[in-house]
Amino acid sequence: MAVIQFIKGINETVVADVSLTRSRDGSKGTATFRFNNPDILKSGMEDKGDITGMYLKDDEGELMTRDVSAKFINGKPQAVEAIYIIKSPQEWDRFMRFMEKYANENKLSFTKAK
């Protein structure tokens, strides 16, 4: 099972749009996650705890980033964006294993940029 959490123990049910970039030599990369109207912004969630990061959890363990921000429209939070930095080929492989599980469970597909 592959899940994303912003507050530990509370799974985000809104599926993210994920954009990936990778350096030419494959040693580094960036994954940008965008959640439109995520559960974490819904009324009553502030009682569950603070957003301390984005946690990518699966059977292998946990990946985490603290680079999480809210996007506001007319003074109201509408989206959450999180950026996960990949610093080595090993981290890239681990991240891709998580994404394969997350994609399969949420019926996502991969489209390569032209």
Swiss-Prot record:
**Organism classification:** Eukaryota, Rhodophyta, Florideophyceae, Rhodymeniophycidae, Gracilariales
Q: Which domain of life is it from?
A: Eukaryota
Name of this protein: Photosystem II reaction center Psb28 protein
One of the GO biological process terms:
photosynthesis
Family membership: Belongs to the Psb28 family.
Provide the transmembrane region boundaries: none
UniProt-listed NCBIfam families: PS_II_psb28
How this chain assembles, per its entry, is: Part of the photosystem II complex.
Q: Which organism is it from?
A: Gracilaria tenuistipitata var. liui
